[in-house]
UniProtKB/Swiss-Prot annotation:
The modification Pyrrolidone carboxylic acid is found at Q1. It is found in: Secreted. Its main location: secreted. Expressed by the skin glands. Keywords: Amidation, Amphibian defense peptide, Neuropeptide, Pyrrolidone carboxylic acid, Secreted. The keyword S-adenosyl-L-methionine does not apply. This is Substance P-like peptide 2. It comes from the Eukaryota. It comes from Pseudophryne guentheri (Guenther's toadlet). Coiled coil: none annotated. It holds the Pfam family Tachykinin. GO terms for biological process: defense response; neuropeptide signaling pathway; tachykinin receptor signaling pathway.
Length: 11
């Protein structure tokens, strides 16, 4: 599962 940091990194 993708890490929260990865998700926010896209933003």
């Amino acid at each position: 599962q993708p890490n929260p940091n990865e998700f926010f990194g896209l933003m």
